[in-house]
Amino acid sequence: RTPPARNEPRRPFVYPRLSPEQSARVASSIAGYWAATPDSDWIVQGQNSAWQNKGIGERWHNAWSAAFISWVMCESGLGDPAQFRRAIAHHSYIDQAIVASDTGDERAAYRAYGIGEQRIQPGDLLCRGSRPAYRSLTERRSQLGVGARTHCDIVVKVDEAQEQISVIGGNVRATVRMKVIPATRDDEHPLHPVADNGRPLFAHLQLQAEEIEADALDHAPSLQDKACLVTNLPAIDPLKPSTDC
């Protein structure tokens, strides 16, 4: 990208939209994310109708970022709702982590903390709000159980030297995308994200499990094997997603 000339207004970067062919190729995968999410039948049925009327290249009408997180947790073995409350909206499992932190519930896989309160490790979740735009965990704690538009990403790498945190999330410009968030530290707080593309983060959901290496992502088989970077996906029926959760 060419930087704007001096005094020229900076225009936000716009990610390219998926083509109908790309949307068709990933439709079955996204249907699988929804299948791992309770109470999502109506969403899949509605999308089936859209596909039948407009073709399989029609994009998903409902945001699927929480479904992606739910699918990851299902694949990780967190099938018990007492461990992780898989849901079509992020605020459901955010609230579960807040309650677990407040009550000491040892069954829950995550506990909620404010940004900078605890050290961030791979497997943790970082969350922000848009409606409302929460600026602290306290603000959400006062609205437990109330619907809210939120988004969470999974931490996959913490780079202390470069002061960066890499995260992966779903439905980021209609894709599963990894991004790098700048971070900072001070005498009172460990390394923590500054913001997510200018939007404040309000919650750090800490995974209650043994820590792994902060750079474990670098040694992941999918990154070591260049063949895994090819985007060809197996062709399966997108109208009949299945899951073991």
Feature map (PLM): residue ranges:
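Residue-level marker of intrinsically disordered, low-complexity segments enriched
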Residues: 28, 41-42, 156, 166, ...
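N-terminal capping segments
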Residues: 1-81, 221-245
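Short regulatory "switch" loops immediately downstream of catalytic or recognition motifs
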Residues: 77-78, 127-137, 180-187
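Low-complexity, Gly/Ser/Thr/Pro-rich intrinsically disordered linker/tail segments
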Residues: 171-245
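Phenylalanine-focused residue identity feature
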Residues: 13, 60, 68, 84, ...
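...with weaker cross-activation on analogous glycine-rich loops/strands in unrelated enzymes
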Residues: 85-173
